[in-house]
Amino acid sequence: MNKRLILAAAAAVMSLQMNAAEINESNEATETEAKKEVKLSDIVSKPKFSGYMIGNYNATFQDDNNSNTFSIRLIRLVMTGRILNDFEYKIQGQVNGNSSTFGESPRIVDMSLEWLKHKEFRVKIGQFKRPFTYENPMNPIDIGFNSQAQVVQKLAGFSDRTGEQSSSGRDIGVQVSGDLLPNSEGRTLLHYEVGVFNGQGINRKDVGNQKDVIGGVWVSPIKGMRIGGFGWVGSYARTGYWSDGMIEESGTRKVGRYRYAISAEYKDADWQIRSEYIHNTGGAFKTTANTSSDLKDCNYNEKLGDSADGVYVACVAPIIRGKLRAKARYDLYRPAGSWDSAKTIYKAGINYLFCKNIEIQTEYSFVNDRSLAKHNYSMADVQFSVRF
């Protein structure tokens, strides 16, 4: 009887020990998995997804050339996240458009990685906005008008004067930037940014092995205000064919891009007052790169010459704060650097915010284009935008 009791007790003890061991192993496995999960989240953050859509209606009132149309201006999808907490990545794609022309096709517009450990010295590499002008890096909805100013479009890489494909102000390269001289409130007084780029726009390798150097610096004397300048030294190149009199030649040709901008801005939650003057020295190709065959056309646009400039002054002011805003813009561009080529657009309109993510922008434009036989005409635009 005693032997049976002893054996039963021993069996019970062994069973308890085995259960305890299994529990310990299970707890250790759970702790190990938890450590793995924590470790993974420390390395790569959960991606954040966002985007925006812009649709518009445009009517042009021009003698014998009236037109009106609905269109989808932009649909952009964005993914951002952190790696090792100090690196931020960004991927942005444009999903609307066609597949036949470079400037209107679905494409990757941003793909970059930026080291953000020190606000005084940040490093970005990949495809991203050129550091040139205040308006270029702005979200198109935040600009407050149906498009960037003419001079920004032509001299900051949107529909660039050189004939470069439409690149939304972007290029491939590396950039350093930083904010310096913090005041007693912690607001920095000086910002700098400078980068080295291919000079070919988005999704293109370098041609001609000459890089563009672009940079800017500004001071912020009071909150919301910045005053600064930008410079751009580089070129745009093509490899293909051109005619020199009666002789057809082949090889690589380039046009220079020597540009500077003088910029000033005041901005808060409702107010925007911004003005920029931009000057260009450097020629242009005869064709704009919309297709692969255009990239092989190396004929120069002799008529356009090698000088251009422009200026704009824009104001967006609150009528009802956070809800209703009035706006106006003076927008001058001289594609050949002369008044005979000048195109001036006077804009005025109203923007209404249904909420922070939904906005309707309306404007009327009076255009004076001296390159046309009949200089004057007008346009009306309604733009509807959604952020998500």
Describe the role of every protein-language-model region.
Residues I23-N27, F61-N65, L84, G103, ...:
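Outer-membrane beta-barrel pore domains
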Residues L16, A21-N24, R107, N209, ...:
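Intrinsic disorder/low-complexity signature
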Residues M1-I54:
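N-terminal periplasmic/intermembrane-space "pro-region" immediately following the signal or transit peptide
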Residues R4-I6, E37-V38, V78, I278, ...:
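Residue-level detector of intrinsically disordered/flexible regions characterized by low predicted structural confidence
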Residues K36-G199, V207-I214, W218-I227, Y312-P318, ...:
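Outer membrane beta-barrel
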Residues S15-L16, E88, T288:
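Hydrophobic alpha-helical membrane context
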